[in-house]
UniProtKB/Swiss-Prot annotation:
Keyword Disulfide bond: yes
Activity regulation information from UniProt: Allosterically regulated by ATP and dNTP.
Cofactor(s) listed in the protein's UniProt record: adenosylcob(III)alamin
Disulfide bonds: C124-C427
Protein name according to UniProt: Adenosylcobalamin-dependent ribonucleoside-triphosphate reductase
Chain residue ranges for the region called Effector region-2: 173-321
InterPro entries listed in its UniProt record: RdRp_reductase_class-2, RNR-II_ins_dom, RNR_alpha_hel, RTP_Rdtase_AdoCbl-dep
Keywords from the UniProt entry: Allosteric enzyme, Cobalamin, Cobalt, Disulfide bond, DNA replication, Oxidoreductase, Redox-active center
Keyword Disulfide bond carried by entry: yes
UniProt-annotated stretches for the region Adenosylcobalamin-binding-1: 573-634
Record: active site: C416, E418
Subunit structure: Monomer.
GO biological process: DNA replication
Amino acid sequence: MNTATQASVSLTPEFIAATEKEITPHWGELGWVTYKRTYARWLPEQQRNEEWPETVKRVVEGNINLDPRLQADTVTPEVLTELTTEAQNLFRLIYGLAATPSGRNLWISGTDYQHRNGDALNNCWFIAVRPQAYGDSHILPSYLTQDQVAVSMPFSFMFDQLMKGGGVGFSVTPNNVHQMPVVDQTVDLTIVIDPESASYADSVALGAVNRSEWMHDNSLADVRFYRLPDTREGWVLANANMMDAHFNSTNPEKKTKVVLDISDIRPKNAPIHGFGGTASGPMPLVEMLFDINQILNNAVGRQLTAVDCTDMGNMIGKTVVAGNVRRSAELALGGAEDDAFITMKQDKDQLYHHRWASNNSVAVDSDFTDYAPIADSIQHNGEPGIVNLGLSRNYGRLIDGRQEGIDEAVEGTNPCGEISLSNGEPCNLFEVFPSVAEEQGWQLEDAFGLGARYTKRVTFSHYDWEVSRKAIQKNRRIGVSMSGIQDWILKTFKQRVVTGFEAKHDAETGKTFMQPIYNQAAVNRFNALYQAVVKADQDYSDTLGCQPSIKHTTVKPSGTVAKLAGVSEGMHFHYARYLIQRIRFQDSDPLLPALKASGYKVEPDVYSQNTMCVEFPVKAAHADEPAFASAGEVSMAEQFATQAFLQTYWSDNAVSCTVTFQPEEGQDISDLLLQYRHTIKSTSLLPYSGADFKQAPKEPIDAATYDAKCQEITADVAEKFAAMTGNHDQKDIELVDQSDCESGACPIR
């Protein structure tokens, strides 16, 4: 639990009212609707969701009060004045949508959930799948000591963080899975449930048995028995109990029977307090426990493989989705020469059952050159992605040269690949929209500096897992990002950042590659902004007496957050110059009448019952300028070159990028991966998909169609909703089938 502050900073109603008059939020075409259904929290006393100023106030106050100086016995007036001014600046910045913290912070910061759960403000995590000790953590199985290693630990970490709404990258590279012990014994798993439970019939249908009858016929003397409390931790510990029973080191009595009692788990549709939403009942957990136990039983007498470990991780992810977190973001990182791992999604039955739950990537270093089989798999399946651990461990920005071991503990990334992470470490994100910030009168150095300080404060949260606390205290890693990059480059430099290519011989491979030429003014500006972030972090670290951050900058994929401000997503190019963006709503959503009354096209979804599809016409920024290029027009080579530019001059962490390619470009994937092996820390590729099916999420249109669609919109939906409902809303209504990034890998909030 977070330590209560001795003094606190708050924003006055007078300040907020004055800011509302002074600044107009830069809502994108879908911005307000996306906000209302994603980040506006329910206010039970008023029977409505938050309005934007209330959300920003909550978020800013939740962050500014993490400053450790506020926990001192005596807090000076100077500190309170300094932090109040900073809170006001942050409010102006975020309220205007010139910048935002991560979607996770928009949803959680300033809530009771933040104070109860130390991990709450971090989007994503990384864990190495090898036997580890639980340490001084909020979860510790009763049969273990803190320093006793257990096979279950990385899976418990993964399960816990996914249920708290985070995403998890996990490594099943050979050096990790080879540390797994041989599976010693089969386990006879029994799941019992009270016949009075509302979940009884559904659970029995999945293999659970009547608790009263089982207890009458059996003794607990020779079994490992665990009665699950109705908590997140109970689900985690049930799985740990079953997993660890397979190994003599964590089951020295060699008991082969495990009995798990799920009678106390709340039934389906009961409210989940804290994170929000409603419960699934125990049924997804029952299915998962039997499935994971079967994998372990099948492995008796041998070590677990990367595929086994990924399957178990995917089954956990599947359970969390069914458990009503809505999405669980996973990235499995395997060996570049592990054919079984690389091809595991080709088994369609397993893919549809659980292997869909992770994006899969392979770990390489710059000496790796055999990209042909990987490129072939990418061309046909869009996977695996590439993560260059050697670059991540020894480089910040590429322009700063090799810095041996600067980040030597890195073992993987978060699911979207923009932050290289050590074992147990989270990403910690904030992004600035440079075009919007400049329009609203901000000096970009100041905006990025506020982002550095915001993320630095998050590192002073109290973290639930010892492995995370150690990594954060050592690294204080932050990830200040920018989004709308293509918009800002076109607006500022009047051309795209890649101005051409020139042939260059690669002595290592004997090949000739086309080396990109960059706009020098852009090089200089990105470099200056990077230095501003580093200076802001250094100055704040000096003030707080803590470690400067090991790395500072990144490019996150964005998506939902970029929609708020209506900017291009991360470094990605706009999907099209003009398009129809379709958003799906639950058919009971109170926003739908307001959308229809405002002139938006609303129709039943052709794929899902109880769902309505709404069309929003969207025009890309600078769509009519000669230098504009959409994702369907820009070459794969230019996308690689743009990612390399950002890795060289801006990001000392990594750059999240999903490179899209046309069918005729597939043959070039291998050579481009080879060309940029010394430059790009992580990347993924997907075929560019047009809108060749009904109600596609994005459908390119021409300018005339866009203008006609806009003519049909006769009112502002926020004003119409207020007029029709008095802003009274309905609890737990979300958009259907959202994704927060190009690859669909991120949690939304």
